[in-house]
Amino acid sequence: MRIILIGRSDPTSCIPRLRVAGLLSELRAKDLAFSVAESAALLDTHGLRVDTADITQLHRRTEGWPAGLRLAALTIEQAEDVHTAVAQFTGSNHAVADYLFTEVIRGMPADLVEFLLATCAPEELDIGLARQLSGRQDAGQVLERLSRANALVLQMADPAVYRYHSILRTYLAAELTKRAPARLLRQHMVTADWLIGKPSYAAALSHSVASGDENHLVRLIERNGIRMIHSGKGGRLLAAAREAKLPLDRLPLIAAMAALAALDVGDLATADTVLAAHSHSAFDPRSTMLFRIAHVQRRMLGGDVISALDRTSMLSWARTGEPDLDLLMLVCRGSARLRPGDTAGAINDLTAALELATSLGHDETVLWTLSQLSGATGSACDFLGMQHWSNRAIEFARPRGWARSPRLAYAYLLAAWTGFQTGEIDSQSLYAQLAEEALGRHPNVEVELGVRSMAALAAFESSTGFGRYEAATHFHDLWQAPAAREVSPALTGFAVPQEVRLALSIGELTWARDAAARVAGRFPGSAEALVLAAEVLAARGKNREALTILRRLRQDDVPVHVRTTLVAADVLAARLILAAGDRHGSLSRLIDAFDWADQRGFRRPFLDAGAWLAELIATSTGEFGRHERFAAQILQSLTDSDDSAGRPTSIVSPLTRRETEVLRDLPSQRYFDQIAQDYGVSVNTVKTHVASIYRKLGVTGRREAVLEARRIGLL
């Protein structure tokens, strides 16, 4: 025999014993709740055609409660506009209110009804908050009793937290508004103060706005606004200020926080409006400091960061003793220091910021700081440190569900750079893609240009044929943008040599020359400018002039922005010296390059060198001293042609754009006159291009040219 009991509350007798004995099957309200599809089917039985968005909203409002859905169907049937009826379907709806009063409220003792009315504002009701709102010390017992007696009062996973069904809660709020509206507003205020202590910033802001008390919201933001920004709630702070129509022109501290919040979520238009409105005003010290931080942060999203640092005197600021404000300053200043190339200062500020953010429990700021530290150590050419910090950032983000957070984009970029400089192309490609996916709407200029450049570089390394030409073109275009003049010396020092390499690989000598001139204009007399000038001269066959320039790097007074530049210079010098017939001199310069690169695992310039370096290493085994193992690793990478298809090779001179186009026609069986007709040129012109292709590839015939071009990734 089976006994079925149906009721809105648990029977008090025998149920616990049956449950323990395993003789009881229970179907609770959540088991009987309709799914979205079932809700749609119910409406369909009433002949109602409701779109997916409205069905979803209705299901969210009713939480699948069958009676609520039935009432909604009856309401929609009588409505002129379905969308409006759904939007207005809450506990204040007449049909719903009548049902709840008749079926739920009327049979309750007066003290329980009063308790429900006194605690209806919060979406989730902590027992402590219930005590404070109701004034009843037995609030926990009351809530437990209500949850047992009524399916519309739910106990959460945390047994100390309850929730009223949204329909019941909106009914109670509407009823309280009719009886004593000030009580409901007071509830929102008390709830906001309670939630701030949890902390639950977004919900606290919502309740403060709902209280209608501007002074309360202002105090809440003034005391907690910086903390909200550190916790990733800047967007909610900004929305609350808008909803409440706070007069920012009369509230400088709130205005400064609103500007910082807008910058945090990439709302540059709002940030610019607020900053412009307060650009010539005098404020209290705290507001002034926040506005100055906002000005520097705005410049980091596009503008002259170095001038902003000078105008704000931020580099000389001492700590204030207010932890959240100090953290904001350290993170901003640490990131900004990278623009003028102050990597040591950046690392000091960011290390202090990481310690402070960790102690304060601001995980979002911890993630940002870890990412920035990976960039700062990378700028200092500490590649092991860079890998350490980027890995820490990625590992920190993963369990928190932040794998696509814009705060992680920089760490992904540096992880991709690690893969690039070590020759791990699959890793480079993966992290370059993740970095692009993580970019926000208006990211830091340095981060965005770095990420976009890395994506183009990854596409170049993993492509063959015309795909390489497209990737190189995209890389070139990125560095023509005005933002390229705003990035740090480190990013310029790492990226522009790749711009030159890619340009030369597709025959765009003019692009390479322009890139070298750009660096010379920004960093005149620097090692970076000299090496790029030498690269361009070497590409034009002017090896002697290139070597003359490279010798100047041995002078002590040549400024160096990234130490890797000198490694690249030694590798280039080794190639040119070898081409002049001096094997011993070439080997000596190569060992100079190994001296710095070996202990740091820096391989990229050697991987870019190609066949001449492979041959030099292979014929010099035993001559590298403590670098024998490193030399063997480089040789292995260079000779693994199957695994490195598409890497730079021994091509004597880069192909021009037209030669690249003609090369793509060579695998076909078409005659030269047919190819000439396609391009609108003479047969002799095509033959001239083909002869140049053969010479540059070091082959003597069409079939050999195709095979060699495929081997080196040009096809």
Spell out what each predicted region is.
Residues A157, A180, G197, D213, ...:
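Short coil/turn linker motifs that delimit alpha-helical repeat modules in TPR/alpha-solenoid proteins
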